[in-house]
Amino acid sequence: MYTFLALAPILVVLVLLVILRLPAKISMGVAYLVTALLALFVWQASGAQVAAATVNGIIVALTLLFIVFGAILLLNTLKEGGAIVAIRKGFMDISPDRRIQVIIVAWLFCSMVEGSSGFGTPSAIGAPLLLALGFPAMASVMAVLIIQSTPVSFGAVGTPVLLGVWTGINDKPDITQAIAPLSTENYLLQIAGNIGLIHALVGFLIPLLLSGFLTRFFGKNRSFVEGLKVWPFAIFAGLCFTVPYYLVAKYLGPEFPSLVGGFVGLMIVLPLAKRGFLMPKETFDFAPRAKWDEDWLGSLPEERFDDSIAPRFSLVRAFSPYLIVIGLLILTRVIAPLKAFLTGNLTTIEFTNLFGTTISSKIQLAYSPGTILIIASLICILLFKMNGQAVKRSWSSSATTMVAAAPALLLSVPMVQVFINSGSAAEVVNSLPAMPILLAESAAGAFQNAWPLVSPWIGAMGAFIAGSNTVSNMMFAYFQWSTASQIGLDANLAAQVVALQAVGGAAGNMIAVHNVVAACAVVGLMDKEGYVIRKTLVAMTYYAIQAGLIGMGIIFGQIWWWILAVIWPIAFFGIMAMTSKKAVA
């Protein structure tokens, strides 16, 4: 019974948001009430615990809104300054094919952004950029969410592994004994290599899947097959990222795989794409905007382009704000003294032990990607010689969009925090663990030796709930290791199970509710979150199943698991192809 009750908040979100497609501000409001009532009256969490989790959620939501504001401000500033015209022309010169553009921008560029910053920054930068290139708002959001899978485990310079997995496995006597004489630090590097391998084996097909989803849901013909026609370029772009990504993860550690993979991929793919290497014979474009479904459109004003008019700026100058953002993100994350200052006491507002609980929260605006996006926007004023009216329009419209996004985030994140912190109060007899832990324990009891097949789904559940691969790994890394040990796996194979947790947690970012809400907000796509999740849930399902099959093959060494790992992508792409020419979901 408790397992079903623990599942209730997730079911409420799925039914209201995904199936009934109600706005997130309504769905998450109901989910928050259900979660809070269960925590108080069934789990018997203290009122102070629920209140502290709620306040922490509000603080996190406000920091996300700050990033949303910065992302929209940069887009609006580029529009008002005239730089978008040059950026659009630059990408059109590389290829006018939307399938090629989405692979370059979402898969390669946003993966590099994920490697430098993470925590939703790829959506904040990539979705507005695709929108500016003429993509429907919903297509822009779908694309940047689907790629938040392979690069996520090593996002923010390896934070999901260095902080998330490390917190789960460090100072655990049973792990220390099992891995001796290996140190925990070296064991973490082993896990990082495992993560890189599984992601690489699954992720190299993501550009092809992305192209198929683009044509299936947003093409004139609603044809998944139309997206598959770029398979040589898509697989090439997939390998250009995943090969250096895996090599860095295996031999250098978890800090730079996504950053290096994205950068190397761009350096190889961009010049070759401009020369027409592996380009499809037919160019894919969207139907005229007048024929787009209303659900695809955001609230941001439509941009009209006359490609016969020469841009006012060179592509390098127009794109330089994005280069500034990437540069500042890398500097503030990699240079230790600078990072220490930006996250130190002088620049941090901290709320410790809220309402007498162990829950604490902090605000680090100086370290926030939102601040970097605002700095880049201010530089644009000088760079593009903007007048006062243009600056005023960009700031006011950005503030309006942020305010419209606020209700959904201010309800989504507190619901998540209450769910995570729902464990029974210390004085309660027959206390219950927090809801996500109880769900994971129930799954472990049910699946036993098939656990590697299920392991990615636990990671995905953690990310879906928490909106973070890092938090998912913190919650479940030790649980995954313990479960692996209980079914008789040695330390080396248990490291593979922990890797599957991290891989699933990365894939779960595609459907994490407040990630989706924030991504929709930066393109003005309000109240359409459920429509987006219906699409990204399909991609996440593909990723988690494939990771589980590969995990079973690695851990148990049976050839038929590897055969299934080959059959599953073929079957998935075949099923998607058979759904062509049907109404958009």
Residue ranges and their predicted role:
Residues 22, 79-83, 96-97, 130-140, ...:
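Juxtamembrane helix-boundary/capping and inter-helix hinge elements in multi-pass membrane proteins
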Residues 1-6, 204-353, 527-531, 545, ...:
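Long, contiguous bundles of hydrophobic transmembrane helices that form the permeation core
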Residues 161-194, 241-243, 490-493, 516-585:
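Transmembrane alpha-helical segments and their short flanking loops
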Residues 121-131, 145, 158-170, 213-214, ...:
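Re-entrant/interfacial helical elements at transmembrane boundaries that shape
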Residues 51-134, 141-142, 386-483, 487:
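Membrane-embedded alpha-helical segments and adjacent helix-loop junctions characteristic
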Residues 99-111, 137-150, 163, 177-207, ...:
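Alpha-helical transmembrane segments of multi-pass membrane proteins
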Residues 1-73, 77, 85-90, 307-311, ...:
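Hydrophobic transmembrane alpha-helices of multi-pass solute/ion transporters
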Residues 8-19, 31-41, 68-73, 110, ...:
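Hydrophobic core segments of alpha-helical transmembrane domains in multi-pass membrane transport
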